[in-house]
């Protein structure tokens, strides 16, 4: 049934309810896709609500990676506290440093790109 639906046909076979709801929210304009670029060039399309904060984006990235690892059979642990302690998310050269600040306040819109950049050590 999901495979034949034109709105949901892009979803993977082992789809979760969360992914279905995100896709529907995208279609109704209640959510946006943020393209997260990893340092190896891989782009992860992450869905967040329109008024999402930086923290919401970080949680969505974690969920996206977790689901992808489960589907591909890779059961490797990622220390997200290490990731967020070591890397900044950036958009158009601006670091997304405040977790409570809305993505909209950083100028991030639907289909905009966000990338990881290594934090500089402070002495």
From Swiss-Prot:
Which Pfam family is one of those matched by this entry?
Ubiquitin_4
Protein name per its UniProtKB record: U11/U12 small nuclear ribonucleoprotein 25 kDa protein
Q: What is its main location?
A: nucleus
Q: Which Gene3D superfamilies match?
A: Phosphatidylinositol 3-kinase Catalytic Subunit, Chain A, domain 1
GO terms in the biological process aspect are: mRNA splicing, via spliceosome
Oligomeric and partner information: Component of the U11/U12 snRNPs that are part of the U12-type spliceosome.
- Compartment annotation: Nucleus
Please provide the record's keywords in A-Z order: mRNA processing, mRNA splicing, Nucleus, Spliceosome
InterPro entries (alphabetical): SNRNP25, SNRNP25_ubiquitin, Ubiquitin-like_domsf
**One CC-aspect GO term:** U12-type spliceosomal complex
The Ubiquitin-like domain, residue ranges: 32-123
